[in-house]
Amino acid sequence: MIKSPPSSPRPRRTFLAQTLGLTALAATGVNALAQAKPTIKIGFVDGWSDSVATTHLAASIIRSKLGYPVELVPLAAGIMWQGVARGDLDMTLSAWLPVTHEAYLTNFKDKVQIIGANYPGAKIGLIVPDYVKATSLADLNNFRADFDNRIVGIDAGAGVMKKTEEAIKAYGLEMRLLPSSGPAMAAELDRAYRANKAIAVTGWIPHWMFAKYKLRFLADPKNIYGAEEHVDSVINPGLNAKAPAVVAFLKKFSWKPEEIGAVMLAVEGGSKPAAAAEKWMADNTARVSEWTS
């Protein structure tokens, strides 16, 4: 009996090689697609609770819904604006206009693009606990001893600090403005509130402290701090070509006091900003869809 020669293994090996080659090519293609989207660099002010909340929510949406890698860069407000203008940053969601960041806008208006408000109805001024006697900047001198003749501020050079310096002159306040930081100011407020002591701080809304304490702004009859403001999304113009889907999202993204308040309070309560943002996204899928559809 004549035995048939064994079949050559070469065709099988060739097939396997081709299959593996196609698989590798497919994998390379997938990786290329995954890497095709550029990293979006977002500047924010780490000591501002609204900036932290809004930035982390936007970053989570851009990553998970739009598929872009995101890098968050904490900076002082002036450097943040400069970074967007120079193209070192693609965007910020922390531009307070028209008053607080007026000087920055004047300096960089030809190099940035204002997309619109992500939080309307913002406000800056001097904030006091609801139990204090003073009601207005105009009569604050009458109660200055209650406040130990001082106003607790935030970072020197911040817009609200400059306006407070103007207010001290305009109202003839015999009080010292003490620079600190956002977290330090909030800690001072917490200590005074727990002890039922009078305290005046430079502040703003949105801020988690309005959800935690009963506070109010002192009236400003001379309108030193200006009318209501809005927190805007501002981009480097190059983002239009770099990530048009991100720009489209920013044009729709605007949230309400109770929405941002929930994230800010969660962070103040100990949650990591990214975790608080992701939980809010999971609990508000319809709202997120409005911004990304």
Where are these regions (language model features)?
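N-terminal secretory signal peptides
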Residues: M1-G29, L33
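Extracytoplasmic "Venus flytrap"
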Residues: T39-H56, A77
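Short helix-initiation/N-cap motifs at beta->coil->alpha
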Residues: W48-S49, E71-G83, L177-E188
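An extracytoplasmic/periplasmic, membrane-proximal ligand-sensing/linker region
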Residues: A53, E166-M175, P179-N196, W208-F210, ...
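A conserved helix-loop-strand patch within extracytoplasmic ligand-binding domains
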Residues: D110-G157
